[in-house]
A protein has these predicted regions:
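Activation/maturation switch segments at domain boundaries
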Residues: 1, 89-173
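N-terminal leader/targeting and assembly helices and adjacent pre-domain segments
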Residues: 1-96
Length: 173
């Protein structure tokens, strides 16, 4: 006999989570762009589109954030004075496009993973409500030493109740 419970990456819970929250943490974009990114994330989950492919769609919608814009400006200003204005512009455009690609993949990965995690959490709550998962069940923050930010690495191993929030230096997560 099976428990009658499961989760897959195309879950309705993850899609609902994405519909409600995807894009909320993206800075320096307007509401319309946020809604467009949200739709890409929902479609990505529903259709099983990998974050890298979703990022290709997102990069058409987002620009540089303030720190990236300042870094780009400094880069162009520090280029050799012997370069022609056209060569400087070309180098600047190349770096700008690279920065936007990086930003888009960061957004895609973060928003898809966050939505999938939110969907999993909703599935766990439903499992608890059905008596399939104990009321004392916990979730644990797991990171690898590579690719995770300092905030996430500091949370590694922390466990909280299923509906609880992890405590971080920037507040609850």
């Amino acid at each position: 006999r099976t428990a009658g419970f499961g989760f897959n990456a195309k879950s309705r819970e993850a899609q609902r989570w994405a519909t409600k929250f995807a894009g909320d943490r993206i800075t320096t974009i307007n509401t319309e762009t946020k809604l467009a990114v949200r739709k890409i994330v929902v479609d990505s989950i529903r259709e099983g589109i990998p974050p890298r492919d979703a990022a290709k769609q997102i990069r058409e919608m987002v620009g540089l954030n303030r720190p990236q814009g300042l870094a780009l400006r400094r880069y162009v200003q520090k280029l050799s004075p012997s370069l022609s204005p056209a060569a400087k512009a070309k180098a600047g455009i190349k770096l700008k496009n690279k920065m936007i690609r990086r930003r888009a993949i960061t957004i895609a990965r973060t928003e898809v993973i966050d939505s999938l995690s939110g969907g999993v959490e909703q599935a766990w709550v439903q499992a608890q409500q059905k008596g399939l998962l104990g009321s004392n069940a916990k979730k644990e923050w797991v990171t690898t030493p590579f690719g995770a930010c300092a905030i996430c690495r500091a949370l590694n191993g922390q466990s909280v109740k299923i509906t609880g929030m992890f405590s971080s230096e920037i507040g609850p997560l």
